[in-house]
A protein has these predicted regions:
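Basic/aromatic-rich interaction segments and small domains that mediate binding to polyanionic partners
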Residues: 2-58
Length: 58
């Protein structure tokens, strides 16, 4: 439900892009936007991707 707060945050988790972005696949999740997440790649570039486009490494 929308009124309940759950602390299942994936912010700070390492992830791997399924489809590489300009040769880069590894990054860190820095924010969540519902179905999309913001990923900072190892080259410093920040991109917005859908959750099903990444593998989250716990």
């Amino acid at each position: 439900m929308y009124g309940l707060y759950e602390d299942n945050s994936i912010i700070g988790a390492y992830c791997t892009l399924i489809v590489p972005y300009k040769g880069y696949t590894e990054g860190t999740i820095i924010d969540e936007y519902g179905a999309e997440i913001l990923v900072r790649l190892t080259n410093g570039k920040e991109i917005s991707v859908y959750r099903d486009e990444v593998i989250i490494n716990d």
